[in-house]
């Protein structure tokens, strides 16, 4: 089992001002507070096997250089250069870095990757060019740092067409000589069947090119059924990927609960790590296990202790 970090939202409480209004979301920290981003990476490197870049929503389509005051090429260069620097600064060559790339839907305001809303959800060519152009721009911005990236993580894919696009791109580019994984969104229990169908489609296309498959940013209450679903679908040579979030639940009018608020309190780091650690041997340990939104160093350090 390899342990992933808690994602980029853990940086938000550490910033001197809010960046929640930025379309770049946590990628805005690369623009305004690169020194805090380095400290964020260094903190997680102390307990995790893999750290992830702040590039989830970073894309030319939503980046305004006049507003940000920093050339996008420089921000792209820092996005991979800062984690590489953090790893080398701490002298931890056996730790890994994942280039984190969100869905095209993540560039549409309103967390649309969780609502499966795109401008053109079945436009294969548009989605292909979106992902291809972004990776090429990141690579060109800092070729030396890109060489030192270990994984490429295509995250929060909510639609089967985009999953097909990513599979084709990975095959065409021979994975950029990286290990590539794909994760889907699963915001509700009712969406597990959709996720299962997307994963089945990925496996039917070209799973030889895909290193790992799983689900990211889902509520802890969905961990058990999602883990069972992955166990039933994934062949032994594909790494299972699971990173649940640390959020609470809100109560719907019908009395059911859904991810997104604190009407039902979020699990404590102790509770989150205890539940998550139970799945550390899933898929015979061929697994990446970590955190997502609203998990932090405390969650992951406790998970490390419980999975030693």
Swiss-Prot record:
The residues covered by the Hcy-binding domain are 1-307
| Keyword Methyltransferase carried by entry | yes
Q: Tell me the keywords, alphabetical order.
A: Methyltransferase, Transferase
Q: Fetch the InterPro entries from UniProt.
A: Betaine-hCys_S-MeTrfase_BHMT, HCY_dom, HCY_dom_sf
GO function terms (MF aspect): S-adenosylmethionine-homocysteine S-methyltransferase activity; zinc ion binding
Pfam families, alphabetized? S-methyl_trans (PF02574)
Which BP terms in the Gene Ontology apply to this protein?
Answer: cysteine metabolic process; methionine biosynthetic process; methylation
This protein's record includes keyword Nucleus:
no
* One GO cellular component term noted in the UniProt record for this chain: nucleus
By what name is this protein known? Uncharacterized protein C57A7.07c
Q: Which organism is it from?
A: Schizosaccharomyces pombe (strain 972 / ATCC 24843)
Classification lineage:
Eukaryota, Fungi, Dikarya, Ascomycota, Taphrinomycotina
